[in-house]
Swiss-Prot record:
Organism: Scolopendra mutilans (Chinese red-headed centipede)
Location(s) in or outside the cell: Secreted
Keyword Lipid metabolism found: no
GO cellular component terms, semicolon-separated: extracellular region
Keyword S-adenosyl-L-methionine: no
Name of protein: Kappa-scoloptoxin(07)-Ssm2b
Family, per entry: Belongs to the scoloptoxin-07 family.
Lineage, uppermost ranks: Eukaryota, Metazoa, Ecdysozoa, Arthropoda, Myriapoda
Signal peptide limits: 1-19
The organism's place on the tree of life at top rank: Eukaryota
Post-translational modification remark: Contains 3 disulfide bonds.
Amino acid sequence: MLVFYALLFVSVFSSTVMGATIDKPILREAIEEIDVNKRAKNPYCKEENCPPGKHCPKVPIACVYGPCCF
């Protein structure tokens, strides 16, 4: 019985390790895509969204509603 569990563990562990080494480029691309999407949906105040005469504060603040210009 112990031998069965040992073989099961080795087979699962080796497939997990091999799967991780094969999928590294795919995971790297997915992580980069997530980072790009986060930058595109940046919640901080953007100067180009402010109406004329108003500006973003010097300290970056996250905007929940609207462009948050002062």
